[in-house]
């Protein structure tokens, strides 16, 4: 039976480090306030002129190098982002161009913080049915250019960072290696709990002076509701994956959760009963890079030796929509 193996990982973050103290120049906040509520010490923001496609290409090159695979062997690109470089076309085609590729499909997905797992689910299905052999899966975000750097937007602005992460997925016949299963869900009744209202194609014009004055072009969130659902849905969907494969939480060697908030990750860890050495968090250094958090964290965990061949990797995410998902991978 054909399975999907993760054969290479890579990531790229901007060189501009933005500390909590720097944010105090823009809004009423403090390093202590941010750390206590989010666990974040600093995040990376792009410099002017940096594109999502450019960061995605850097992460992709690292992942391809790690896999020992030339870019020309990639059969398809799946790219997850909620902050595309342009309204259209999708960022995936710009990544394709950056890598010097031609004619292969480039699919953009918008599933917010769950985007990488949605992308993994799609890519895994393509590989299992034999449609493609080698797929480049990327999560990339530039959030810093779209946040409200004032006290009004403080709850959101302190969270977000920029970056890209990539994984090279390849078909394998190894019976003990690869993606065991993916599990994805959505619940649109909560769509306005975490969202960005403008610009919007149903508006004429898509964005106007009133939208700008009222900050509708900035992301908005009911933090309490998001927290409540995140700490419930992520352990639940991990349990779904474990049950589907006849496994228990004790079988997990490494959990890489979406890096939304350190308090959320810690709550998920407690509910699953995992020790500190079986979870990987890096939100302290990068903030929430939405669709890029999982591949960035995975790439770092691999380079730190946190995964051994045959180990059980669990990925889980929760995000705007609401969307959420999980995956189990035998490394």
List the model feature ranges, each with a label:
Residues 7-10, 80, 110, 135-141, ...:
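Short beta-strand segments
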Residues 1-48, 151-228, 232, 236, ...:
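Condensing-enzyme catalytic core mediating Claisen C-C bond formation in acyl metabolism
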Residues 128-164:
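Flexible, glycine-rich active-site loops centered on histidine and acidic residues
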Residues 6-8, 34, 63, 74-77, ...:
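Buried hydrophobic positions in well-ordered alpha/beta secondary-structure cores of metabolic enzymes
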Residues 27-36, 86-100, 137-146, 206-211, ...:
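Acidic-glycine-rich active-site phosphate/pyrophosphate-binding loop
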Residues 53, 57-60, 64, 83-84, ...:
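Claisen-condensing/thiolase-fold acyl-transfer catalytic domains that form or cleave C-C bonds
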Residues 66, 70-102:
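Anion-binding (especially nucleotide phosphate/pyrophosphate-binding) glycine-rich loop
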Residues 72-80, 249-258:
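Short glycine-rich phosphate-binding loop at a beta-alpha junction
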């Amino acid at each position: 039976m054909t399975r999907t193996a993760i054969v290479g990982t890579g990531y790229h973050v901007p060189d501009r480090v933005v500390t909590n103290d720097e944010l105090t120049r823009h809004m009423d906040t403090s390093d202590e306030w941010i750390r206590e509520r989010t666990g974040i010490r600093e995040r990376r923001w792009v410099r002017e002129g940096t594109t999502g496609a450019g960061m995605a290409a850097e992460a992709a090159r690292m992942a391809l190098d790690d896999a020992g695979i030339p870019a020309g062997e990639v059969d398809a690109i799946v790219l997850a982002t909620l902050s595309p470089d342009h309204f259209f076309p999708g960022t995936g085609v710009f990544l394709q161009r950056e890598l010097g590729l031609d004619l292969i499909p480039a699919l953009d997905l918008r599933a917010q913080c769950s985007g990488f797992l949605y992308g993994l689910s799609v890519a895994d299905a393509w590989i299992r049915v034999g449609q493609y052999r080698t797929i480049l899966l990327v999560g990339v975000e530039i959030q810093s250019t779209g946040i409200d750097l004032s006290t009004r937007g403080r709850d959101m602005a302190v969270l977000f960072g920029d970056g890209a992460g990539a994984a090279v997925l390849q078909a394998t016949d190894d019976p003990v290696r690869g993606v065991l299963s993916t599990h994805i869900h959505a619940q649109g009744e909560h769509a306005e709990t975490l969202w960005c209202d403008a610009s919007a194609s149903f508006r004429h014009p898509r964005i106007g002076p009133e939208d700008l004055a009222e900050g509708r072009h900035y992301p908005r969130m009911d933090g309490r509701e998001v927290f409540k659902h995140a700490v419930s849905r992520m352990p639940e969907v991990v349990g779904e994956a474990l049950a589907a494969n006849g496994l228990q939480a004790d079988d997990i060697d490494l959990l890489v959760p979406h890096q939304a908030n350190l308090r959320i990750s810690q709550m998920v860890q407690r509910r699953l009963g995992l020790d500190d050495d079986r979870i990987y968090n890096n939100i302290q250094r990068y903030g929430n890079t939405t669709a890029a958090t999982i591949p960035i964290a995975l790439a770092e965990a691999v380079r730190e030796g946190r995964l051994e061949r045959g180990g059980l990797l669990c990925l889980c995410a929760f995000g705007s929509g609401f969307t959420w998902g999980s995956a189990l991978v035998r490394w």
